[in-house]
């Protein structure tokens, strides 16, 4: 897809991978609708518009989608489902509230956003949905059962919907990033950021690479890890 002039929705745009993705898309000529709970700091561009949206609530997603089409036009070409969060802890000490918060954001929110854009993408017979999962969607991790469960769900959802919409000219790509330098690790005891991590810009570059492939060329899954693991102190 030639991204010049295309309209892209990026969820979780406030920081990290979402912010980096919005910036790279703008550099490629796209018009970007950034959805998030707070406006990203320092992102000013005549082709960027922020729409407040908490993806945990379907009504908020529907309102953001309606507002996006009203402000940027009916055709939506790209959806990057990036909004997500992770909470760690052993299962027997994990709060039900935290469990539901993760599923509401990582799984239900992704479903709401995808459901919103699909009718328009089907009508135009063109679109690309990129779902940001995690390495945690490919293997279990100690004290991360809830987070892993949400990302395995994203994996299954992506693989299924790809088969549903491929004949409508719509691509679905699922990314599985490894350790990335964001604030994800701030709330996880005993887990610290380290110098070997990938940067949000690395993930954003991979997203754009997948988006810019020729029409009949489709990257279904992308698994990314740092070349070198964390050095042991």
Where in this protein do the model-derived segments appear?
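Conserved glycine-rich cofactor-binding loop
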Residues: 7, 14-15
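Active-site helix of classical SDR
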Residues: 114, 150
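The beta1-alpha1 cofactor-binding region of Rossmann-like NAD(H)/NADP(H)-dependent oxidoreductases
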Residues: 53-63, 96
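Conserved glycine-rich Rossmann-like NAD(P)H-binding loop of the short-chain dehydrogenase/reductase
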Residues: 28-43
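C-terminal helical subdomain
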Residues: 168-170, 174-175, 190-230
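Substrate-binding pocket helix/loop in short-chain dehydrogenase/reductase
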Residues: 90-91, 98-100
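Residue(s) in the substrate-gating loop at a strand-loop-helix junction
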Residues: 134
């Amino acid at each position: 897809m030639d991204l010049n002039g295309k309209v892209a929705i990026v969820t979780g745009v406030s920081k990290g991978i979402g912010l980096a993705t919005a910036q790279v898309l703008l550099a490629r000529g796209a018009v970007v609708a950034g959805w998030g709970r707070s406006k990203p700091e320092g992102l000013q561009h005549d082709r960027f518009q922020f729409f407040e949206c908490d993806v945990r609530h379907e009504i908020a997603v529907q309102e953001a989608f309606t507002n996006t089409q009203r402000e940027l036009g009916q055709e939506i070409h790209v959806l990057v489902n990036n909004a997500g969060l992770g909470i760690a802890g052993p299962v027997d000490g994990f709060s039900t509230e935290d469990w539901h918060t993760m599923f509401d954001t990582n799984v239900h929110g992704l479903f709401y956003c995808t459901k919103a854009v699909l009718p328009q993408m089907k009508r135009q017979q063109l679109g690309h949905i990129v779902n940001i999962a995690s390495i945690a969607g490919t293997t279990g991790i100690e004290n991360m059962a809830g987070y892993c469960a949400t990302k395995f769900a994203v994996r299954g959802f992506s693989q299924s919907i790809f088969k549903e919409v491929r004949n409508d000219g719509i691509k679905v790509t699922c990314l599985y990033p490894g350790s990335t330098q964001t604030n994800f690790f701030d709330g996880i005891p005993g887990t610290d950021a380290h110098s070997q991590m990938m940067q949000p810009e690395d993930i954003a570059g991979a997203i754009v690479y997948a988006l810019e492939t020729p029409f009949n060329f489709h990257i279904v899954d992308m698994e990314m890890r740092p070349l070198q693991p964390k050095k042991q102190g």
